[in-house]
Amino acid sequence: GRIPTRDNLHDLFNGLAWFAFPQAKARLNAMQARALKKASADEGRGPLRDAVTIFDENGLVLACSSDELAQALRRFDWRTLFVERRTATLMQTEPWAIGHGLLEKLVRPYKAITAHALIVPVDDSYFRASPQQRRTTIDRLVADWLDNWPFFTARDLCPLPVLGLPGWWPDN
């Protein structure tokens, strides 16, 4: 298919997100279209459309094989995630930026960049797969999650200060 874009980084990154995560992006697009069709002008966006928009713009998928690290993220326990369990975070998680607005922010990084992260449980074998296989797996898992969670709200996403992620920023 074709992806309409304007001449700016925001649309370029949206196009790249479509190429990298076609199943997940298609689900997000379909969910937004359904929410738009249902919504009346008086209601505003509503919780589903809010969540879809936030994730589409600022989403990050965190593949995670550790319940302890997933819980640390849900508790906003940055010390555990980024300092005390730094090696485990490097070995048992893999972040995938899916939000095109997030990618645009990362062109000129600043300390306070915070993604809206969807934690996707994976087993240890995930980390032995090739990067292409892992990306394809993440695309499928996110698409499946979106298909099977009709009550998606922004509360399903965890704030994640991305420059705190081990390996994402030279000053870290």
Feature map (PLM): residue ranges:
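Hydrophobic alpha-helical segments and helix pairs
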Residues: G1-S40
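A contiguous, surface-oriented mixed alpha/beta subdomain in the mid-to-C-terminal portion of proteins
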Residues: A33-N172
